[in-house]
Amino acid sequence: MNKQPEDWLDEVPEDKNDDDDEIIWVSKSEIKRDAEALKDLGTELVELGKNALEKIPLDEDLLAAVELAQKIKKEGRRRQIQLIGKMLRARDVEPIQTALDKLKNRHNQQVSLFHKLETLRDRLVEEGDDVIPTVLELYPEADRQQLRSLVRNAQKEKAANKPPKSYRQIFQYLRELAEKQ
């Protein structure tokens, strides 16, 4: 048997002050969490529509994989999403994540605007002409006469238990005004 002398334990290699040689230890759990996060990002990409997907900066291979996953059902889709996650590990996902966040934020802003418009419409129908000056302050290009006519018709429809045609038209009119700004 070849025995090493016991003094080999006392030998300490010289320290090199190079930061480039530093090894960063990453736990297996952290690697799994990162892989799962990338797989979730891939799932979000697969769930996007074609128009939204065009706004995300994806290379050809990744875009083809996402489009294929959108066509596949059940178990094959799960495997394809895992492949997309694997492909994302080899890429810089920061621009992709940023573009996704912008899309989500735009959607949240639109939902918030719709809630505000619905509240304004409800106030118009309930309180009538008293709220019209508020609407004109928010949207100066609004037509007072058209708005009053829609509000009166909506109130009549509500009193007669008719379908809320004018109620919907008020919302559409308010949405058009909001989009013009």
Swiss-Prot record:
<dbReference type="GO" id="GO:0043022">
    <property type="term" value="F:ribosome binding"/>
</dbReference>
<protein>
    <recommendedName>
        <fullName>Dual-action ribosomal maturation protein DarP</fullName>
    </recommendedName>
</protein>
<dbReference type="GO" id="GO:0005829">
    <property type="term" value="C:cytosol"/>
</dbReference>
<dbReference type="GO" id="GO:0019843">
    <property type="term" value="F:rRNA binding"/>
</dbReference>
<keyword id="KW-0699">rRNA-binding</keyword>
<keyword id="KW-0690">Ribosome biogenesis</keyword>
<comment type="similarity">
    <text>Belongs to the DarP family.</text>
</comment>
<dbReference type="GO" id="GO:1902626">
    <property type="term" value="P:assembly of large subunit precursor of preribosome"/>
</dbReference>
<keyword id="KW-0963">Cytoplasm</keyword>
<dbReference type="InterPro" id="IPR006839">
    <property type="entry name" value="DarP"/>
</dbReference>
<dbReference type="InterPro" id="IPR023153">
    <property type="entry name" value="DarP_sf"/>
</dbReference>
<comment type="function">
    <text>Member of a network of 50S ribosomal subunit biogenesis factors which assembles along the 30S-50S interface, preventing incorrect 23S rRNA structures from forming. Promotes peptidyl transferase center (PTC) maturation.</text>
</comment>
<dbReference type="Pfam" id="PF04751">
    <property type="entry name" value="DarP"/>
</dbReference>
<keyword id="KW-0694">RNA-binding</keyword>
